[in-house]
């Protein structure tokens, strides 16, 4: 039974990681408000190494539609500005001395719908990942049956437990999706 518990625990942990990855993906997709996590995935070249933006500058929210980026070193201003411009976010930073202001444009209805479509794709990818984890766990359990290490009753119970874990995580994905869709469609 210890092996089965380990398999279930592993499946739950891997599904939690998928759920966290989905939350991070959702955080990158902005709604109408500025938030610092919007720029988290942007990397800049710093002395030959690509590092996250938040390791070379202070990112803060100036107002509901503006982020401010304050580099710790003056020579990083143009590098950071270029990194923000070339990101897939479609933002146009404005530099004022050593402070980079990043105004967020108002989302059009068309862009909102496109973002909802992207959010749904991310959620579906998370669901698929969780189903794959379930499949892997069930396969491992079937291997134990072949090696006669567990009984068929144990197999059935373990597969039911893994299915419950999967259902729970997929429900969480659906809840996150509903919240994010509502957030994106808010005017």
From Swiss-Prot:
Any one Gene Ontology MF annotation carried by this entry is: ribosomal large subunit binding
> Which Pfam families does the annotation name?
RRF (PF01765)
Gene3D superfamilies in the record, alphabetically?
Answer: 3.30.1360.40, Ribosome-recycling factor
Record carries keyword Protein biosynthesis? yes
Q: Name one GO biological process term.
A: cytoplasmic translational termination
Does the UniProt entry include the keyword Protein biosynthesis? Answer: yes
| Keywords annotated in UniProt | Cytoplasm, Protein biosynthesis
Q: Which GO terms describe its cellular component?
A: cytosol
Localization, UniProt: Cytoplasm
Its family remark reads:
Belongs to the RRF family.
Its biological purpose: Responsible for the release of ribosomes from messenger RNA at the termination of protein biosynthesis. May increase the efficiency of translation by recycling ribosomes from one round of translation to another.
Official protein name in the record: Ribosome-recycling factor
Species assigned in the record: Nitrosococcus oceani (strain ATCC 19707 / BCRC 17464 / JCM 30415 / NCIMB 11848 / C-107)
Q: Which gene encodes it?
A: frr
């Amino acid at each position: 039974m210890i092996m089965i518990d380990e398999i279930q625990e592993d499946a739950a942990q891997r599904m939690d990681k998928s759920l966290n990855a989905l939350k991070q993906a959702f955080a990158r997709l902005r709604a109408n408000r500025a938030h610092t996590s919007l720029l988290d995935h942007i990397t800049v070249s710093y002395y030959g190494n690509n590092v996250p933006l938040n390791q070379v500058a202070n990112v803060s929210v100036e107002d509901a539609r503006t982020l401010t980026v304050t580099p710790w070193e003056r020579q990083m201003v143009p590098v950071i500005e270029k990194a923000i411009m070339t990101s897939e976010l479609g933002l146009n930073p404005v530099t004022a001395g050593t402070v980079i202001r990043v105004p967020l444009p108002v989302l059009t209805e068309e862009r909102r719908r496109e973002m909802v479509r992207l959010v749904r794709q991310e959620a579906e990818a998370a669901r698929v990942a969780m189903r794959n984890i379930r499949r892997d766990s069930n396969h491992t359990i079937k291997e134990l049956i072949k090696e006669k290490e567990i009984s068929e009753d144990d197999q059935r119970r373990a597969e039911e437990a893994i299915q419950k874990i999967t259902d729970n995580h997929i429900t969480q994905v659906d809840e996150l999706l509903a919240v994010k869709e509502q957030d994106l469609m808010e005017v």
